[in-house]
From Swiss-Prot:
Swiss-Prot/TrEMBL catalytic activity: a plastoquinone + NADH + (n+1) H(+)(in) = a plastoquinol + NAD(+) + n H(+)(out); a plastoquinone + NADPH + (n+1) H(+)(in) = a plastoquinol + NADP(+) + n H(+)(out)
Annotated localization: Plastid, Chloroplast thylakoid membrane
Catalytic class of the enzyme: translocase
Gene Ontology CC terms, in alphabetical order: chloroplast thylakoid membrane
Main location, first listed in the record: plastid
Function description: NDH shuttles electrons from NAD(P)H:plastoquinone, via FMN and iron-sulfur (Fe-S) centers, to quinones in the photosynthetic chain and possibly in a chloroplast respiratory chain. The immediate electron acceptor for the enzyme in this species is believed to be plastoquinone. Couples the redox reaction to proton translocation, and thus conserves the redox energy in a proton gradient.
Keywords of the record: Chloroplast, Membrane, NAD, NADP, Plastid, Plastoquinone, Quinone, Thylakoid, Translocase, Transport
Protein name from the UniProt record: NAD(P)H-quinone oxidoreductase subunit H, chloroplastic
PROSITE patterns associated with the record: COMPLEX1_49K (PS00535)
Protein family membership: Belongs to the complex I 49 kDa subunit family.
Molecular-function annotations in GO: NAD binding; oxidoreductase activity, acting on NAD(P)H, quinone or similar compound as acceptor; quinone binding
GO biological process, one term: photosynthesis, light reaction
Gene that this polypeptide is encoded by: ndhH
Listed SUPFAM superfamilies: HydB/Nqo4-like
Length: 393
């Protein structure tokens, strides 16, 4: 980083990678003129694990447990993108019941992600009480996940052609009860936070992003919608069964940290609407397309070799990726999560390029914090909502 040429004595401060407000192993080299930020340089890569290269040496079903380690607070979305790509390459039809259950799980995961953004964001700017409130509601969401998938996090629930298991007995009633309860809690959040004058002083007019600027930087998700651009892939691409439900895109015009907070808060209410409609209209039928497990062994006799008969040596793939390329995307809680996938007629992807929303959204941070106060860095970074697992991959 070049030191700005000025007549003043500037101070260079390292924030992170262990600072609690960095939300992971993010390091910021901040140049200060007193309390004013002159420059900021993010240093990434502390959590890089080579996720794209690992994908090239795994069958899709083997790779599914890895993808939940990208954004480990919204694992359903990383699983969804991992199975949606091969499904589109192979023209695999997903049963309607499986599609509805996927939507329910995705929206519950969106609520859990937004809740775990809200608590630490409020703690960053000095409000401790909401931090404990959101963990109470988040526990209910994780109880639902545990009942349906067996895991509170890292669910490993999605499969090519459907899901791993059907919903257990009594789960739908339990989820409907949670929806009714959670709507009342969102009203409590609004009373506790939205009208708080100290909170408004910290976030209003801080980190403003214009609509054109947001598009030029490639921002997505609440970062884009808070800048006056009503763009949501659930409406644009109509993946899964989102076009069968009535809900509205939540967006704001101001483009500041308060607008991003309001977008995420109202998105949780819209997610509850989608979940309630999906639960009430949940169709019957199978939860998985079993034909997707078929594999043409005549075309590749190598898979019949002796070593492939033992899973400890070489596991035989159960799905073949056709020789074509595809970009597939979903609307994750943090923005557009995309995969550029290239198949080459084998069980392993030839290329697996990840488009993480947090990494793209983080690029605008140096522009937002310049000419702001040092204390505003926590507010702006918190409003972006990043998880270093998906930023570094």
């Amino acid at each position: 980083m070049k030191r700005p040429v000025t007549g003043k004595d500037l101070m260079i401060v390292n924030m992170g990678p262990h600072h609690p407000s960095m939300h992971g192993v993010l390091r910021l080299i901040v140049t200060l003129d007193g309390e004013d930020v002159v420059d900021c340089e993010p240093i990434l890569g502390y959590l890089h694990r080579g996720m794209e290269k690992i994908a090239e040496n795994r069958a899709i079903i083997q790779y599914l447990p890895y993808v939940t380690r990208w954004d480990y607070l919204a694992t359903m979305f990383t699983e969804a993108i991992t199975v949606n790509g091969p499904e589109q390459l192979g023209n695999i039809q997903v049963p309607k019941r499986a599609s509805y259950i996927r939507v329910i799980m995705l929206e519950l995961s969106r609520i859990a992600s937004h809740l775990l953004w809200l608590g630490p964001f409020m703690a960053d700017i000095g409000a401790q009480t909401p931090f404990f409130y959101i963990f109470r509601e988040r526990e209910f969401v994780y109880d639902l996940f545990e009942a349906a998938t067996g895991m509170r996090m890292m669910h490993n629930f999605f499969r090519i052609g459907g899901i791993a298991a059907d919903l257990p007995y009594g789960w739908i009633d339990k989820c409907l009860d949670f929806c009714d309860y959670f709507l009342t809690e969102v009203v409590e959040y609004q009373k506790l936070i939205t009208r708080n004058p100290i909170f408004l002083e910290r976030v209003e007019g801080v980190g403003i992003i214009g609509g054109e600027e947001a598009i030029n930087w490639g921002l997505s998700g609440p970062m884009l919608r808070a800048s006056g651009i009503p763009w949501d892939l659930r409406k644009v691409d109509r993946y899964e069964s989102y076009d069968e439900f009535e809900w509205e895109i939540q967006w704001q015009k101001q483009g500041d940290s308060l607008a991003r907070y309001l977008v995420r808060l109202s998105e949780m209410t819209e997610s509850i609407k989608i979940i309630q409609q999906a639960l009430e209209g949940l169709p019957g039928g199978p939860y998985e397309n079993l034909e997707s497990r078929g594999f043409d062994r005549k075309r590749n006799p190598e898979w019949n070799d002796f070593e492939y008969r033992f899973i400890s040596k070489k596991p035989s793939p159960t799905f073949e990726l056709s020789k074509q390329e595809l970009y597939v995307r979903v609307e994750a809680p943090k923005g557009e999560l995309g995969i550029f996938l290239i198949g080459d007629q084998s069980g392993f992807p030839w290329r697996w390029k990840i488009r993480p929303p947090g990494f793209i959204n983080l690029q605008i941070l140096p522009e937002l914090v310049k000419r702001m106060k040092l204390a505003d860095i926590m507010t702006i970074l918190g409003s972006i909502d990043i998880i270093m697992g998906e930023v570094d991959r």
